[in-house]
Amino acid sequence: MATIDVAKERVRRTGPRELSVEVTPRYRLMWGLIRAVVRLLFDVRASGLEHWPKPPFQLVANHHNGWDPMLVISVVPVEPRITWFGPREANFSRGFKNRVMAYFGGMIPYNPDRTTLTSAVRAVRGVFEARGVLGIFAEGRIGFREAQLLEFEAGAAAFAVTSGVPVVPCAIVGSTDLWFRKRVQVRFGPPIWTDAVRGRAARLALDARIRAGVAALLPDTEPRLPRRRPLAFLTDLLNGADDIARRRSGPR
């Protein structure tokens, strides 16, 4: 019985050891499919791609919708590859978005109940060693205001600092409420360099700079919703049940 319990614990604590961080044929297929579907459904525009440094680097973005990773992928080149760090995702075998991203190797799951921190850190290091891009939604959960950021989780730039790679701020504007052919903008800011950051105070200051960099890319005011919003169900199509409940529960 004890042997079975140990085996179950090993399975429960597994991490993303087999994560592929190369631009594989499978990833190219995912990139092409996502790009085609997202651009069919929405009018997605990108700005600031010229700010991207040579990889590896870390992308820090706001988070308004379950569509956000795919919206970003739809406007960036197939190389360098973006791998998303998903600390809030408890089960990548459930939900359409999670299954698609997990199948194509597009996310690093990290949940304290399921994944060891060591294996997650190893996976992140693999992304940087392969000269890839690590994407993080630093708020840790979905927010519902276009012009505001939630508080960033502590250590949003910890991986970048540890590896000495730059951070690129990213703002996804227009994904809070979605409908057919809705315009969504993916904005990238100038890179923030981390190689000279030392000590806790410097890391806290870096986190503040990154948050300010993302905030500077957001609109000044909340948008007004039009009366006609065809296929408005797209808003919550890829959101989890908890996020849908929060959206519908009252003030944002």
List the model feature ranges, each with a label.
Residues 42, 80-82, 105, 132, ...:
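A structural micro-motif
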Residues 46, 93-95, 118-121:
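Structural motif corresponding to alpha-helix initiation and N-cap regions
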Residues 23-24, 45, 87-88, 113-114, ...:
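A generic secondary-structure micro-motif detector
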Residues 37, 77, 101-102, 127, ...:
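A generic structural signal for well-ordered alpha-helical segments
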Residues 2-26, 55, 118-252:
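Non-catalytic C-terminal accessory region of glycerolipid acyltransferases
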Residues 18-41, 93-105, 178-181, 238-242:
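Alpha-helical membrane-targeting segments
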Residues 26-27, 33-63:
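Helix-to-loop junction immediately C-terminal to a conserved catalytic motif
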Residues 53-114:
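Catalytic core of membrane glycerolipid acyltransferases/transacylases, capturing the structured
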